[in-house]
Design a protein with these regions (language model features):
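Short, hydrophobic transmembrane alpha-helix segments
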Residues: 17-27, 49, 53
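Juxtamembrane membrane-interface segments at transmembrane-helix boundaries in membrane proteins
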Residues: 1, 15-23, 76-79, 144-152, ...
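Helix-boundary capping/turn motifs
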Residues: 7-10, 34-38, 63-66, 163-164
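Membrane-interface recognition of transmembrane alpha-helix starts
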Residues: 1-12, 22, 29-32, 123
Length: 266
């Protein structure tokens, strides 16, 4: 109960701070999405601190998360610089701290690298395709022109594509654990991934419900139409990737079970 009160109080403070700084001119669903993400990070940090273990946690997912947050943060300096930037900076700081603990902290010995995606495969199959796609299909905003404009547009697009697949290594790792045991415990790692799922649902709703989405998808120029279509696909892919896990997580809660059983588990 105390932890729930602390989280609730933290979210209230976050909401009040954003409202005060930006005078109420912000996307409520986006703030709720970032709040859910921060709650997930709080659960994760609590796990690392109290359990002194990062067992079942994917370092690749944390690195990809830090990567897309950093790219989006750098690009937003030129294009937004609003509450999005503030909330992304908070998420990046928390993610960076988790990575530091998993790599160099005392809990690094509990990291199961054998079940995680290798750094080489992460770069080859996840990062590079996002970079190439970001260069080829990006918003083409003209606020910043020349080489810097091309780079910032590519960074922004790359962050969108990378965000869509960042959680994939974590889900694969959890599947590997579930296949070995026949189930996965509904523990802190599961709570963290479920919070990401809630954040993703809110983020997708925020994106789709914005009035400018129709102009993205049905823009006047062919390149802008393409960017709008790829952005929408990225949002849907990321939501669908997490939907399967969230379904089985909610099912375990409804059934009163502490175990999450996937459809492929026995």
């Amino acid at each position: 109960l105390g932890a729930a009160a602390a989280v609730g109080g933290g979210l209230l403070v976050l909401w009040a701070a954003v409202h005060y700084l930006f005078g109420g001119h912000f996307d409520a669903l986006f703030v709720a999405m970032e709040a859910a993400h921060i709650v997930g990070m709080a659960v994760l940090i609590r796990k690392l601190g109290s359990e002194r273990s990062c067992e079942g946690l994917s370092l690749r997912t944390q690195e990809l998360t830090a990567g897309y947050l950093l790219l989006r943060l750098l690009a937003s300096v030129f294009y937004e610089g609003n509450h999005h930037t503030l909330l992304d900076a908070a998420s990046l700081a928390a993610t960076g701290w988790v990575i530091q603990l998993m790599r160099h902290g005392q809990i690094s010995k509990t990291y199961d690298a054998a079940r995680d995606l290798s750094p080489k495969d992460s770069v080859k199959f996840l990062v590079l395709p996002c970079v190439v796609l970001g260069v080829l299909v990006n918003p083409g905003l003209t606020r910043v022109r020349g080489l810097l404009g091309f780079v910032t547009n590519s960074m922004w697009a790359c962050s969108v594509y990378m965000e869509a697949i960042a959680v994939a290594p974590q889900l694969v790792m959890m599947r590997n654990i579930a296949e070995k045991k026949g189930y996965m415990e509904r523990n802190s790692t599961a709570h963290y991934v479920f919070a990401l799922g809630i954040a993703r649902f809110l983020g997708c709703a925020s994106w789709i419900l914005q009035p400018r989405v129709l102009s993205y998808v049905f823009g006047q120029t062919r390149s802008f139409k393409l960017w709008g279509a790829f952005s929408l696909i990225s949002e849907l892919v990321q939501t669908l990737i997490l939907a399967d896990f969230c379904y089985y997580y909610i099912k375990s809660v409804v059934e009163g079970s502490l175990l999450v059983r996937f459809h492929s588990s026995v």
